[in-house]
């Protein structure tokens, strides 16, 4: 300890830091391992995080193989195995590409990725501590204070909760201290290299957190300017602003090779453009629990504070000092204001849904407050100690005043806070030497961290149930669904669809198949637009599992196989008659059925439908129109005549208990209430339930009780309901709803997201395919999972005859692309057409594709909203498509230019 508290040696500091970090990290890891759990979150961790890391490792090894073995440089930019076919950079950037630490995956075999995944979780947290300590030492803070501040920073709610689910959520904790230190260096007229590179790496690492870093970068620079310079002028402010903008621009230019393609993709997503609900204030219970949650429970909207109670003692010490640390006091007030006002969470979350995922930055502030307050502990006056005592009493009373705030975790935090304040105010009386107080505060800090960890991973909290079992995560990606398709032994280029047979999304990416499932943060806007206009039964923009078994959509997407699990033959779509492969046993067995009339990757139309005419059509007519003509903005082909043979079926409604009807609305006051639609559907048809502009509003406990019933209740019972009502929005208000639709043993669910839901993308139109029926459907039963009011413009039952689909499919496939080969960033094939036609490729449209017909570049158009087409003259043709990530070349040029400017700056500084 004596060597540790000495002023000169930092080696001992990092040895002690590493030792304590290792002990606490082992304690965290043991909570998982001791319960047979891995650190892989089942929901997103398996299909996204772990899957992406394994993919990236293979990707890097393949690139190195082409360089050192094949002696050529090929960077794959497009992969048909990701969803319907996706850009690799823009899809995986959010998870792995750009993060320097994930480069380690190149050394780890795919089957050992889980080990690397878990190591990286703790390595990121460790580096965050190193980064914070470097920032503290730059500002000449003592090692004792820096040591404790570092532990406060890295072992808070954000890391023990959020970073375990999303490992890369620790990355901004590494970058922010370095960026802020870079700002300080510029103000001190030191070299700007740290600022430039910390900014560039954070921009390349993750666009989402980089946006937040930019906001805090600006706030910090403004605070530091007024804190450093006593003489100020508009000219001086503008001078510094120009300087910072210049260095910032250089950093962005360096990062542009990754940042530019990703940010341009982001701007095109529905999720980015959706208008989310932003309340003026949070609900009352949020404020009632706020103070206690800072050192205890997790708040809503990702406000996972959970800081050690020792940190709050540092806040009290800081505020007891008059006329000192004004910048930190104002910063503390500002960031607390951000947490208290929903609009701040809206802005800091990229003007999306309200979320406090920026709270890791609050953690740096509160940790640094403790670092600055620590030396003050030894010089506190009696008056200042009294102030600290009053603040402590006030805090404890307010933190535990509300019943909802008096949880075991919050009370434990308050107890540690009282002990910490007692320790702080006892110096000079009980503690006569600083080393003893340092030791006790450090012990309290570690105990506080351990308590927070223990509670977060307790059986009561049940947090660990969300994580996969040890060494099973990668096995789950080897799905029987993909194995059944591979067992068919088909070497062609095709897709498979499924219903209820896929345990996780994105398994095709791991198994090397082509599917209709996708689940990542960014999605191709052309796919999203198509699904929206087709009313595909999913509320997500970037998460889709299948095509709902819709025959026409399967045909147009070149789906050749349909997979079912167990004995779920009732979900097998029309036209899939022959079993071609299977995998697994019992209920987990999956069977792949072939459609012998499936369309290939490229098929042809002899006529087109102008986009302007297509947009006027009803959803069912749009679907049928796609079999008659290709939808293009303009074309020299003749216009198609659309043959619509669907029929809107008249029905009557039969309501069950807890379900009441009014014009355009269904009021549900009982979970599980049912509404029955009775009708006579067409024979030999697919049957759809279509909801136009479907929306949902939940009902509070008070709203569920009718006025007549309310008047009959006693005052006590009324008060009980009102008490529950006051807490309802925080705890139980549903931001989503589900309608289960059943017909002929087929059961499917329509999910509705409200504008309060974090994945809301603005979708309110749904078509639920209840499957093919030879004899005709007679009823559909809707079961409402949530109480509330379901509103709609139209609720329709439609029968879609399948008789003409086969004939139209055959026509589209008569003159098709043959000898299709998928190369690195390349698709090739041959085709012969007897007349002028449009060749449609069932590959998602992207500006990154360039088409060549017989070696000559040819205009490639967006077709059918989602796919691509090129017009062909009569005769035989060689088709070649090449791909380059949109804006990648511009990004590379900017990066080269940025590096050139950086080198020029270096030489200029040397001179």
Residue ranges and their predicted role:
Residues 1-32, 239, 243, 426-431, ...:
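Start-transfer (signal-anchor) and selected internal transmembrane alpha helices
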Residues 7-8, 647-911:
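Active-site-proximal, structured, solvent-exposed surfaces of multi-pass membrane proteins
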Residues 24-132, 151-173, 266-271, 278-302, ...:
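Membrane-interface coil-to-helix junctions
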Residues 46-60, 64-66, 100, 240-331, ...:
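Periplasmic/ER-lumenal interhelical loops and adjacent helix-loop junctions
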Residues 82-84, 91-94, 446-469, 485-556, ...:
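Extracytoplasmic/lumenal acceptor-recognition loop(s) of multi-pass membrane glycoenzymes
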Residues 101-106, 513, 517-656, 663-665, ...:
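A cross-kingdom signal targeting lumenal/periplasmic-facing segments of multi-pass membrane
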Residues 122-139, 143-228, 240-263, 268, ...:
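Membrane-embedded helix bundles of polyisoprenyl
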Residues 190, 209, 325-343, 347-476, ...:
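Contiguous transmembrane helix-bundle modules in multi-pass membrane proteins
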């Amino acid at each position: 300890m004596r060597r540790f508290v000495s002023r000169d040696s930092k080696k001992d500091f990092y040895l002690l830091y590493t030792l304590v970090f290792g002990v606490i990290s082992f304690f965290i890891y043991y909570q998982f391992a001791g319960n047979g759990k891995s650190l892989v979150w089942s929901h997103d961790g398996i299909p996204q995080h772990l899957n992406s890391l394994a993919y990236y490792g293979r990707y890097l090894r393949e690139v190195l193989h082409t360089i050192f073995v094949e002696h050529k440089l090929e960077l794959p930019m497009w992969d048909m195995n990701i969803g319907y076919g996706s850009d690799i950079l823009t899809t995986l950037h959010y998870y792995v590409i750009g993060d320097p630490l994930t480069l380690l995956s190149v050394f780890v075999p795919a089957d050992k990725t889980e080990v690397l995944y878990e190591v990286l979780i703790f390595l990121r947290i460790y580096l965050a501590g190193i980064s914070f300590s470097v920032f503290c030492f730059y500002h000449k803070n003592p090692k004792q204070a820096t040591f404790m501040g570092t532990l406060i920073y890295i072992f808070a709610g954000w890391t023990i909760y959020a970073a375990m689910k999303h490992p890369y959520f620790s990355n901004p904790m590494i970058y922010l201290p370095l960026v802020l230190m870079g700002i300080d260096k510029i103000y001190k007229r030191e070299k700007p290299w740290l600022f430039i590179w910390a900014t560039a790496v954070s921009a390349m690492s993750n666009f989402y957190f980089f946006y937040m870093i930019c906001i805090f970068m600006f706030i910090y620079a403004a605070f530091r300017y007024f804190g450093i310079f006593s003489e100020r002028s508009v000219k001086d402010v503008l001078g510094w602003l120009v300087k910072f903008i210049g260095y910032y621009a250089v950093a962005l230019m360096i990062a542009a090779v990754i940042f530019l393609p990703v940010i341009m993709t982001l701007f095109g997503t529905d999720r980015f453009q959706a208008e989310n609900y932003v309340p003026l204030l949070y609900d009352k219970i949020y404020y009632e629990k706020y103070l206690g949650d800072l050192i205890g429970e997790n708040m809503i909207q990702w406000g996972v504070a959970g800081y050690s109670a020792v940190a709050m003692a540092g806040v009290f010490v800081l505020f007891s000092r008059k006329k000192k640390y004004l910048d930190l006091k104002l910063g503390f007030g500002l960031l607390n204001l951000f947490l208290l006002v929903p609009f701040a969470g809206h802005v800091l979350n990229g003007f999306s849904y309200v979320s406090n995922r920026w709270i890791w930055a609050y953690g740096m502030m509160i940790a640094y407050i403790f670092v600055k307050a620590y030396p003050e502990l030894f010089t506190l006056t009696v008056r200042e100690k009294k102030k600290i005592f009053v603040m402590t009493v006030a805090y404890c009373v307010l933190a535990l005043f509300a019943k909802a705030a008096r949880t075991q975790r919050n009370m434990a935090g308050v107890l540690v806070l009282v002990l910490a304040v007692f320790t702080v105010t006892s110096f000079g009386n009980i503690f006569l030497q600083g080393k003893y107080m340092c030791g006790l505060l450090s012990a309290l800090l570690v105990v506080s961290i351990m308590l927070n960890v223990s509670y977060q991973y307790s059986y009561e909290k049940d947090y660990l149930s969300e994580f996969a079992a040890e060494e099973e995560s990668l096995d789950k990606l080897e799905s029987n669904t993909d194995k059944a398709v591979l067992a068919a032994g088909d070497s062609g280029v095709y897709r498979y669809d499924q219903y209820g047979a896929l345990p996780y999304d994105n398994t095709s990416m791991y198994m090397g198949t082509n599917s209709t499932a996708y689940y990542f943060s960014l999605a191709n806007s052309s796919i999203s637009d198509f699904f929206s206009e087709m009313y595909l039964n999913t509320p997500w923009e970037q998460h889709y599992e299948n095509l709902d078994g819709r025959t026409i959509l399967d045909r147009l997407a070149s789906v050749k196989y349909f997979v079912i699990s167990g004995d779920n033959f009732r979900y097998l779509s029309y036209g899939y008659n022959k079993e071609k492969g299977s995998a697994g046993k019992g209920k987990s067995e999956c069977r792949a059925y072939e459609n012998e009339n499936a369309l290939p990757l490229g098929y042809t139309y002899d006529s087109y439908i102008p986009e302007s005419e297509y947009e006027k059509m009803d959803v069912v007519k749009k679907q049928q129109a796609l079999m008659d003509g290709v939808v293009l903005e303009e074309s020299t082909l003749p216009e198609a005549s659309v043959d619509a043979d669907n029929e809107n079926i008249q029905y009557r409604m039969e309501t069950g208990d807890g379900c009441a009807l009014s014009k355009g609305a269904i009021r549900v006051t009982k979970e599980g209430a049912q509404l029955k639609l009775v009708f006579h559907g067409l024979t030999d048809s697919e049957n759809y339930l279509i909801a136009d502009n479907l929306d949902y509003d939940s009902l509070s406990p008070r709203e569920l009780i009718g006025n007549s019933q309310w008047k009959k209740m006693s005052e006590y019972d009324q008060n009980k309901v009102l008490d529950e009502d006051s807490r309802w929005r925080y705890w139980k208000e549903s931001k989503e709803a589900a309608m289960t639709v059943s017909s002929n043993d087929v059961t499917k669910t329509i999910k509705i997201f409200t504008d309060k839901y974090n994945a809301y993308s603005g979708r309110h139109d749904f078509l639920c395919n209840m499957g093919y029926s030879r004899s005709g459907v007679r009823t559909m039963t809707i079961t409402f999972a949530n109480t509330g009011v379901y509103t709609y413009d139209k609720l329709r039952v439609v029968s879609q005859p399948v008789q003409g689909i086969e004939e139209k499919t055959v026509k589209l496939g008569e003159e098709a692309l043959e000898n299709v080969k998928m190369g690195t960033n390349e698709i090739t094939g041959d085709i012969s057409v007897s007349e002028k036609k449009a060749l449609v490729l069932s590959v998602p449209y992207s500006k990154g594709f360039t088409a060549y017909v017989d070696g000559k570049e040819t205009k490639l158009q967006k077709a059918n909203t989602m796919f691509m087409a090129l017009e062909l003259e009569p005769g035989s043709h060689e088709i070649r498509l090449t791909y380059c990530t949109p804006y990648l070349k511009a990004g590379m040029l900017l990066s080269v230019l940025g590096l050139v400017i950086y080198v020029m700056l270096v030489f200029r500084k040397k001179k």
